[in-house]
Amino acid sequence: MWKFCCVTEKLTLFLFIYGICIYICIAVPIRSDLSTVFEPEAKGSRITSNYRRSLFNMLGYDNSVHPNNCKGSFLCPMLRGENRACPNAYMKYNRSLIYHGYSSYTASSCTAIYECEGDYPARTGNEIIDEFDQLNLQCSACGTRFFNNDNENTRCYVKLNYCYPDCTEITPSTSEYDYREPVRDW
């Protein structure tokens, strides 16, 4: 088929094809109605961005409801992989506490921050960890995720970011509540 004169050309072609596959599999959004993913709205038209949803709908995640920002330090890719730095940081939040202020926990150069602009509502550690899980599902390292149920004077978010060498943990005032793991019916 094609003849290549050197390894560099083969590598370039491989990287080009690999990049196209990654773009198709991850970056191109799909419709939320998976039965009509490949059907255009009208004959000859393309699917518009208003009807697109991210790949994470297939995983039970809808980014249109709670938009995430996957930006952070340029060193964030170092937090991905086997060391699970960011999940270890946000799992330091205590599920059985109610958080009333700014908090930050760290692990292996990753900081997990809960912050509000305005008044701090009483938010359980379980709710905070759930928001971090959704952020980590999409961004896999650094990013910011805003809560959806805050009042009009408050905007709260969770944030994962690279923090070395300035990693500090800040524990806010908390109160306890009776947390129980949900009962599973399986």
Curated annotation (Swiss-Prot):
The keyword ATP-binding does not apply. Pfam families: MU117. It is a single-pass type II membrane protein. Keywords: Chromosome partition, Endoplasmic reticulum, Meiosis, Membrane, Signal-anchor, Sporulation, Transmembrane, Transmembrane helix. Residues 31-186 are lumenal. The chain crosses the membrane at residues 10-30. It is found in: Endoplasmic reticulum membrane. One of its GO terms (biological process) is meiotic cell cycle. GO terms for cellular component: cytoplasm; endoplasmic reticulum; endoplasmic reticulum membrane. InterPro entries: Mug117. Residues 1-9 are cytoplasmic. Required for correct meiotic chromosome segregation. Appears to also have role in sporulation. This is Meiotically up-regulated gene 117 protein. It comes from Schizosaccharomyces pombe (strain 972 / ATCC 24843). The gene is mug117.
